[in-house]
């Protein structure tokens, strides 16, 4: 309709929409060679953190938009059809923490028999939460905070949710190779 004028939609006349994204990914890793105990033995592990926080605000402002009637030779303002001043504010955050520990062994005997094996433990935990709020019928768009919107129940809304998941597992693998011609592999999880 007339309120979806493409020229107006690419301007900030009908309002603004701003979103901020913040992300942090860390994965420190350590490896220790345990050749002093037996050649080819090692231990390694890591701790991974994936964190994100996002927030945003959209502000809808009414604007003047006219249609012309050639029958009456008059312009009609459709500002009422563009809505009232309203604000939608939201945020969400999530984090995943993963811990992994592994002990492994790699060695070749008599230049013919190669053994490569490891056993590993891993656990991961994920958390997510979100919060949102909406208000309409502001007197002005100069203070677009939720507190300054209408206090009437029909003119406001809010919501949110959260999720938490976790997992733990053990896994491992044993490889045996003979003169790089024959290979046997066993995997367990």
Name each model feature, range by range.
Residues 1-6, 61-84, 127-158:
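Surface-exposed loop/turn segments flanking beta-strands in extracellular/periplasmic regions
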Residues 2-58, 86-109, 114-116, 124, ...:
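Outer-membrane beta-barrel transmembrane strands
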